[in-house]
Amino acid sequence: MAVSYKVNERVLCFHGPLLYEAKIVDTEMKGDVTTYLIHYKGWKNSWDEWVEQDRILQWTEENLKTQKELKNAAISTRQKPTSKKSASSTSKHDSTGVKTSGKRSRESSTVTVDGDSHELPSRIKTQKSESPIPQQVKRDGTTDAKNEETTKPENNEKDDFEEEPPLPKHKISVPDVLKLWLVDDWENITKNQQLIAIPRNPTVRAAIAAFRESKISHLNNEIDVDVFEQAMAGLVIYFNKCLGNMLLYRFERQQYLEIRQQYPDTEMCDLYGVEHLIRLFVSLPELIDRTNMDSQSIECLLNYIEEFLKYLVLHKDEYFIKEYQNAPPNYRSLVGV
């Protein structure tokens, strides 16, 4: 039976793979789906976000125990030393459809997104990124900690402590062209109340597949190919899992709900384009920090992501839309603007 939550109710809410104490600030109906404005205890209001019910748990002893178990698991994972050797795996296809070979041993680590685990192998000799990707890039080059303006709760009572989540340990170097594009994207949607037409063509999956074809012939051996395939498959997984939870601006959520109803059996990577994918790289360093991936796997993944971003810049005319759509009046009334 679905649980409904009330304003000011104390709850637990998933942010990444961990549960945090939070309270319900506001509620809103999007079609037949209830969304909740969440304020995380101890976090500034810039971190408030609209979430659906599947990210919220009731404040119960059982769920508090789950919160503690998840936290302890994350701590033990970070303290665990990287294994230098791993047993040979048997030939099989993993859940992403990418074949792994039993003819060799390789290091691997598990990436968990919203409860689903997927393996990514680790590799060495990758380059670290040099500059952080801002959570919101302004035209003057400065950054803002929030992705769009959020409604502050009327009750501005102080929490027991004022603390924001730590900055990600890892960084993704985003080309300036894409940083400026993110700014324009934010303005078009949140200020101009425009939308990107969905379904998009080419899609996220198509863009990643095209990059794969351009890259794979330059890899040196079968192991490098396998690592690259796993990394690209992982990127698709992250996008599918994160889109509805953290990649949409409030003005887009109604469109997202309509798309889900219209295409119930289609993955989001086959409907959305790179315009939404590049938003993922704002939050990806933080998400990666919370996985149990070893440092070699992380550096390998980030290296391929940065190459992919450079590829998108070279082919920006092919992958990025030229014009946004004006939202019709009935859509604006549904959104409440």
Curated annotation (Swiss-Prot):
Composition bias type Basic and acidic residues, residue spans: 137-158
Localization per record: Nucleus
Annotated stretches, region: Disordered: 70-169
Domain Tudor-knot intervals: 6-56
Positions of disulphide bridges: none
Residues covered by the MRG domain: 166-336
Known role: Component of the NuA4 histone acetyltransferase complex which is involved in transcriptional activation of selected genes principally by acetylation of nucleosomal histone H4 and H2A. The NuA4 complex is also involved in DNA repair. Also involved in deacetylation of histones, chromatin assembly and chromosome segregation. May act as a transcriptional oscillator, directing histone deacetylases to specific chromosomal domains.
Protein name: Chromatin modification-related protein eaf3
Provenance organism: Schizosaccharomyces pombe (strain 972 / ATCC 24843)
Gene field: alp13
